[in-house]
UniProtKB/Swiss-Prot annotation:
A GO CC term attached to the entry: cytosol
GO MF annotation list: adenyl-nucleotide exchange factor activity; protein homodimerization activity; protein-folding chaperone binding; unfolded protein binding
Keywords attached to this entry: Chaperone, Cytoplasm, Stress response
Keyword Chaperone among UniProt keywords: yes
Family membership: Belongs to the GrpE family.
BP GO annotations: protein folding
Protein name: Protein GrpE
Record organism: Polynucleobacter necessarius subsp. necessarius (strain STIR1)
InterPro entries listed in its UniProt record: GrpE, GrpE_coiled_coil, GrpE_head
Region (Disordered): 1-35
Domain of life: Bacteria
Role summary: Participates actively in the response to hyperosmotic and heat shock by preventing the aggregation of stress-denatured proteins, in association with DnaK and GrpE. It is the nucleotide exchange factor for DnaK and may function as a thermosensor. Unfolded proteins bind initially to DnaJ; upon interaction with the DnaJ-bound protein, DnaK hydrolyzes its bound ATP, resulting in the formation of a stable complex. GrpE releases ADP from DnaK; ATP binding to DnaK triggers the release of the substrate protein, thus completing the reaction cycle.
Binding partners and assembly: Homodimer.
Length: 182
């Protein structure tokens, strides 16, 4: 048993006797500088290609966004205009009739006005029509004149022209006269 422990098995003997087998198994193959340069140039080419593709994609996204914004501006009023077409039709119909009756003509105008106000509402456009005695609001009213009145100062005495808002933004303030301070 002591002899068996002292003599290595034949497989270990072969490995120990052949140093070339030992070094190639443990160390990777050494690349020549030309091979390393070729691999690095290939990687550079791949990275440049990826960069150019990403840059082109970014430019395409930006171009499409600009086109989408231009279309949105161009056709933003389209929905509102669709609601105004029936109003225009009613006005043309009124002009083409030979209505001698003022009452019927007035009724037609009232119906057309209701159509117009409905179109305004659908387009998120609302009237600013302050009542007499309302407090003057400089954000929604424009004072044209200040007149002596029995009302409290800075209140609406009369409305000369209605104002309008679009989605809570004042399109035109209501033109009003206000009471002068006493």
């Amino acid at each position: 048993m002591t002899q068996e422990n002292q003599t290595p098995p034949p497989e270990q003997e072969n490995l120990a006797a052949d140093p070339a087998v030992e070094t190639t198994a443990e160390t990777p193959a050494v690349k020549t500088p030309e091979q390393e340069v070729a691999e690095l140039n290939q990687k550079i080419g791949e990275l440049q290609d990826n960069f150019l593709r990403a840059k082109a994609e970014g430019e395409n996204i930006r171009r499409r966004a600009v086109e989408d914004i231009a279309k949105a501006h161009k056709f933003a009023i389209e929905s509102f205009a669709e609601h105004l077409v029936p109003v225009t039709d009613s006005l043309y119909a009124a002009l083409n009739t030979d209505a001698g009756d003022a009452k019927a003509f007035k009724e037609g105008l009232e119906i057309t006005l209701k159509q117009l106000l409905s179109a305004f509402e659908k387009g998120r456009m609302t009237e600013i029509n302050p009542a007499v005695g309302d407090k003057f609001d400089p954000h929604h009213h424009q004072a044209i004149a200040s007149v002596p009145s029995e009302q409290e100062s800075n209140t609406v005495v009369s409305v000369l022209q209605r104002g309008y808002t679009v989605a809570d933004r004042v399109l035109r303030p209501a033109l009003v006269t206000v009471s002068a301070p006493k």
